[in-house]
Amino acid sequence: MRRGGACVQKKEYLPLTSRQPGVCLLSEILVRALEARSFFLVVVTVPAGEVAYAESQVACDSRLSAFPSRTRPVILYVPGAHTRSASVRAGLDAMATHAPDVVLVHDGARPFVSVALIHSVLEATCRYGAAVPVIEATDTPKGVAADGSIETHLIRSRVRLAQTPQGFCYASLCAAHHRAATDGEQYTDDSELYARYGGTVHVCAGERSNVKITYPEDLEQRASEPALTRGISVLPCTEEGALRVGLGTDMHALCAGRPLILAGIHIPSKKGAQGHSDADVLAHASIDALLGAAGLGDIGTFFPSCDGRWKDAHSCALLRHTWQLVRAACWRLVNLDAVVCLEQPALHPFREAMRASLAQALDTHVTRVFVKAKTAERLGPVGSGAAVTAQVVVLLKKI
């Protein structure tokens, strides 16, 4: 969330409705961010000298205190600068000690962002690395020259209107912002800046209700709608404590000359699994189970075999990265239960090492992880020694 020091009219402090003067645009955004239960840190940049005032305005909204303190993210107010880009950069720099994987940048003049849109942008960002919500243009856009004449007739079907929040890999966005500062360049939004310095930005569906308050009549129009005239009554998200089950399976062919890796543990064997990475079926099935339970996608979404970056990759490192994404979405691991099916060699001697390795990758106690080893009784491709398989079930709890 951003406020630049050059803004004269402080729209973010305006009351959302006359019936609830304690609810301002900024506090409404914060309530919706807390409702999403997907953030551990929220940074608000405000004009220099206005930190205390911003805090006092937000404190007037009693809804914020209704969120449990143990799950409430830290809200940090940071002095901004005289340009939009510099203010965003100040906010990003304030996050450096927290080292987030993903960051969403939201305009403080868009108070009607929905929790569903926040989750949609987060999911697309985790999948692609950068994502922006867009809506179709309903009016026919024109490119206008300095003298007021139309110089370009844009194709409306190919034009989209960008909204916020816009999501990015934190480290990549920081690097792009600092390069832009060095070059002295200014951009109207972060997706343009990110793309200018080599990043690819994908789009996801925005919402027409996610309007930007630019003129007084924008707020007046929204305030007259029934949902707002009834008053705003937002309770903490009922998703807290929700349980989700995920299932992951994987199978790889076995061949001579390859190492056999299971949960990051090297298993002495005449044959190993074929694959683009280290072909660790137990780690791969665990990744799929976690992503499925959290509703974030699957292993092919994040680590496609066509991507050379994952050639011979250590799958437990991919599992650790996956868990960071799942944890950032406010999920806690209740337990993981796995079955590995391999005809030979016998896996029982390595079972505890595999449990410990998975627990370490998931930053959890080993008692929450269990691994069972089976044979296929000489049936099918596993029984003939041609393949190895794994099945994993996880239980996640929303926090």
UniProtKB/Swiss-Prot annotation:
Signal peptide, first to last residue: none
Keywords assigned by UniProt, alphabetized: Isoprene biosynthesis, Lyase, Metal-binding, Multifunctional enzyme, Nucleotidyltransferase, Transferase
SUPFAM superfamilies associated with the record: IpsF-like, Nucleotide-diphospho-sugar transferases
PROSITE patterns for the chain: ISPD (PS01295), ISPF (PS01350)
Site (Transition state stabilizer): 3, 276, 375
Cofactor dependency: a divalent metal cation
Reactions mediated catalytically: 2-C-methyl-D-erythritol 4-phosphate + CTP + H(+) = 4-CDP-2-C-methyl-D-erythritol + diphosphate; 4-CDP-2-C-methyl-D-erythritol 2-phosphate = 2-C-methyl-D-erythritol 2,4-cyclic diphosphate + CMP
Record-annotated site: Positions MEP for the nucleophilic attack: 156, 212
2-C-methyl-D-erythritol 4-phosphate cytidylyltransferase: annotated span: 1-243
EC number(s) from the headed UniProt entry: 2.7.7.60, 4.6.1.12
Classification via CDD domains: CDP-ME_synthetase, MECDP_synthase
Function in brief: Bifunctional enzyme that catalyzes the formation of 4-diphosphocytidyl-2-C-methyl-D-erythritol from CTP and 2-C-methyl-D-erythritol 4-phosphate (MEP) (IspD), and catalyzes the conversion of 4-diphosphocytidyl-2-C-methyl-D-erythritol 2-phosphate (CDP-ME2P) to 2-C-methyl-D-erythritol 2,4-cyclodiphosphate (ME-CPP) with a corresponding release of cytidine 5-monophosphate (CMP) (IspF).
Family (UniProt): In the N-terminal section; belongs to the IspD/TarI cytidylyltransferase family. IspD subfamily.
HAMAP family registered for this protein in UniProt: IspF
Name under which the protein is recorded: Bifunctional enzyme IspD/IspF
Organism: Treponema pallidum (strain Nichols)
